[in-house]
């Protein structure tokens, strides 16, 4: 394997050169459930300068068993998918509930074959194409620790960056896990990942960062794992920016608040600053400045 430090994404990623290894190019988007789609779209527009890129009605299916409607919002170089189910039981219009993560692969058919050979199952027999022209296929969550993920092949023409907050990429999805060592091993074994760091947190929890392809996951074992109802629970998203202090100021001008006045530096050299969830629709997000 070849270690790549810094570079375009400012992240030490692990690129595997062995035949049969799975290539994840980037995290395309995070998906959120909401009981009020229009309100959620308006929040991204106001907070991040997002642009609505498309959406519409959704038939009942794996992503939303009751059906409903969705919208894609784009800001900087990233996007979010917002889903309003017909059955809104347990949802609040004030809260964005994390639903799934979408990973980009260069060739979805090859990725399906490679992942199937590794023991993964999928929620359908073949991919579908969404309103943005993206070809995607959800994993069967029984083979992904109970959390929803899908692989995505982007259309041939790249999407130009949008106006709004200058987000460079989604650096990672974060999950709370019952057993940190088992979770690390799963990503290493299943996705050919590399455990690059971690340790105790200020709250007494433990975390670990695992890179696979050109993406990353943060795994967090709480102080009392027995309180978790599932082995893996979606926890947060990290947005990479070039100038974190400038982005903090821009976010504050849009009414967002942060948990501290200045970023802290984590065990792998990333500068991180979380939003106050009272101002981010109850969902945990942070800005990240990647090491050079």
Regions found by a protein language model. Give the residues of each.
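Vicinal oxygen chelate
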Residues: 3-21, 26-35, 70-78, 91-166, 169-178, 198-199, 208-209, ...
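Conserved acetyl-CoA-binding loop of GNAT-fold acetyltransferases
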Residues: 46-52, 119-121, 189-195, 255-257
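A cross-kingdom feature marking solvent-exposed beta-strand/loop segments within repeated
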Residues: 55-68, 86-100, 118-135, 159-160, ...
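Conserved active-site tyrosine of GNAT-family acetyltransferases
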Residues: 40-45, 115, 183-188, 251
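Amphipathic N-proximal alpha-helical interface segments
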Residues: 80-87, 149-154, 219-227, 285-290
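N-terminal beta-strand motif that seeds the catalytic metal site of vicinal oxygen chelate
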Residues: 7-41, 96-105, 152-184, 234-239, ...
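Conserved small-residue-rich
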Residues: 166-215
């Amino acid at each position: 394997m070849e270690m790549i430090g810094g570079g375009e994404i400012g992240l030490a990623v692990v690129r595997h050169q062995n035949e049969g290894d799975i290539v994840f190019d980037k995290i395309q988007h995070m998906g959120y459930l909401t009981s009020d789609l229009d309100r959620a779209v308006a929040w991204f527009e106001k907070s991040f300068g997002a642009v609505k890129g498309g959406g519409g009605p959704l038939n009942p299916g794996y992503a939303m068993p009751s059906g409903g409607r969705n919208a894609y919002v784009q800001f900087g170089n990233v996007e979010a998918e917002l889903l309003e189910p017909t059955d809104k039981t347990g949802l609040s219009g004030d809260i964005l509930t994390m639903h799934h993560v979408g990973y980009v692969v260069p060739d979805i058919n090859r990725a399906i074959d490679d992942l199937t050979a590794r023991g993964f199952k999928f929620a359908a027999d073949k991919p579908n194409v969404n309103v943005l022209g993206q070809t995607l296929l959800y994993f069967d969550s029984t083979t992904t620790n109970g959390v929803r993920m899908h692989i995505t092949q982007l259309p041939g023409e790249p999407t130009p960056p949008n106006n709004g907050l200058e987000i460079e990429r989604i650096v990672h999805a974060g999950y709370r896990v019952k057993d940190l060592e088992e979770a690390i091993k799963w990503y290493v074994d299943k996705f050919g990942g590399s455990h690059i760091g971690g340790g105790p947190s200020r709250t007494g929890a433990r975390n670990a960062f695992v890179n696979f392809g050109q993406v990353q996951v943060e795994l967090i074992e709480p102080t009392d794992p027995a309180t978790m109802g599932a082995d893996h629970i979606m926890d947060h998203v990290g947005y990479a920016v070039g100038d974190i202090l400038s982005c903090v100021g821009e976010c504050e001008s849009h009414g967002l608040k942060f948990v501290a006045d200045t970023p802290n530096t984590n065990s792998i050299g990333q500068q991180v600053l979380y939003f106050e969830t009272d101002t981010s629709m109850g969902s945990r997000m942070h800005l990240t400045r990647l090491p050079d």
